[in-house]
Structures are given as C-alpha cells and as structure tokens.
C-alpha cells in the first residue's frame, strides 16, 4: 500500500500518526517510510486496512471520526479495560471490536 494512504489519514485532525503507529507498527518505521515515500509492507498494509475499516465503522456508529477515536482510545470493561485501538493489531482483536460496534449500531450499548 502506498504511504500516501497514511498521509491522507493523518491530514484528518481526528487521527494522529501516533494513533496509526499503535496499530500499524513502530513510529520510527512509519516516519522513515513517509520520509522516503516508501510503501507499507504487506503486514503493515493489512493492519492499516483493519484500522481504517474499524475507524469508518466506529465513525458511522458515533457520528464522526473524532467521536470514533475517543471511543477507540477509551478503556472498555468488555475488553478487560483495554483500549479497543490496541486490539486492532490482530485479526481476532479486530473482530471483537467490530462485533461490539455492530451491536452498538443495532442499538446495544458499546
């Protein structure tokens, strides 16, 4: 995936490079890729795509990316007081977060 996808997302004031690095990989690696206009690795691309999908789902549930990021960064009892954003590093964690968001979209408490 081209690094411009990361640049485009960081242009949104709701999302920081630090937020992306929590899911995609080390901040220094992302900074280097940005500086060199490099591509994300396949694993980084996969994690970035998962992050984008969950961010868009949460934005739909909560009415925008600012509220979505607030929710993703708030510890949830349902996740043993982990922040949902930290679960997005794995497929299983991502599915757990998506499940809660889908329930919220259908009227259950997130």
Residue spans of the language-model regions?
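Non-transmembrane "mature" sequence context
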Residues: 1-110
């Amino acid at each position: 995936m081209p690094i411009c996808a990361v640049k485009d997302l960081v242009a949104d004031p709701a999302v920081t490079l630090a937020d992306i690095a929590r899911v995609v990989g080390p901040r220094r690696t992302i900074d280097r890729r940005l500086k060199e206009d490099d591509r994300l690795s396949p694993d980084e691309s996969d994690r970035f795509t998962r992050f984008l999908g969950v961010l868009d789902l949460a934005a739909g549930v909560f009415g925008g990316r600012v509220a979505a990021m607030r929710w993703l960064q708030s510890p949830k009892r349902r996740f043993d007081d982990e922040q949902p954003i930290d679960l997005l590093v794995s497929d299983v964690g991502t599915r757990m977060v998506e499940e809660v968001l889908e329930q919220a979209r259908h009227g259950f408490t997130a």
